[in-house]
Amino acid sequence: MIKKVSILNSNFIGVYARTWNDVTFLPVNISDEEKRIFEETLKTEVYKISIGNSFLIGSMLSMNSNGIVVADHGIDNLKSLNINGRNILSINNKLNAAGNNIIANDHAALIHKSFPDSIRKKIEDVLGVETVKGSIAGIKTVGSVAVLNDRGMLVTSEADEDEIKYLSDLFKINVKTGTANFGSNYVGASIIANSNGILVGEATTSIELGRIDDTLS
């Protein structure tokens, strides 16, 4: 299932929410109707949380089946939730917007080039996958220009063929380029997807929807 939606009147829904196949995190000030759309489309447990004083849950949190990486002021809000045994790492670093700076699945993680090696190792341990530093089309905030699930990975249309092959080999998944929200290359900020469903910003065109659906469904 693929559906258009906005969060808090924004089409950049990926900065507000984060999902995996079993759990979804949304900001506390989302409406009950918006929450219901996420539950029905993504088919997961849905929790409304805040991370510090921020509602930008998608920007502040990254996860896979093994672990969660979150900004340093967000860990207490997660400990009381049913997160299916995941490890939790809080990042006390200027790059603590984990959702913007990390893209991960159950095979690998790609992280911002400027993470120190000590934090790279901690991320690797918590997510339980090979973790490498890099960028996508020159963008260091890799989580903002990529989105993935078990079926595929969509990255900014500015990524070249060598990058697409590298990402496909790294994440062991089919990778395609595309846009959302009427031409935005920030697909990670515009799309929320797991293996059960896909949500996209309301400005996404029918052509973009087809590409997204073809990649992630």
Curated annotation (Swiss-Prot):
Cited Pfam families: eIF-6
Gene3D superfamilies referenced in this protein's UniProt entry, alphabetically: L-arginine/glycine Amidinotransferase, Chain A (3.75.10.10)
GO terms, molecular function: ribosome binding; translation initiation factor activity
Keyword field contains Protein biosynthesis: yes
Keywords: Initiation factor, Protein biosynthesis
GO terms of biological process kind: cytosolic ribosome assembly
Ribosomal protein found in the keyword field: no
Role, per record: Binds to the 50S ribosomal subunit and prevents its association with the 30S ribosomal subunit to form the 70S initiation complex.
PANTHER family noted in UniProt: TRANSLATION INITIATION FACTOR 6
NCBIfam families named in the record: eIF-6 (TIGR00323), PRK04046.2-2 (NF003131)
Family membership noted in the UniProt record: Belongs to the eIF-6 family.
Listed name of the protein: Translation initiation factor 6
Gene expressing this chain: eif6
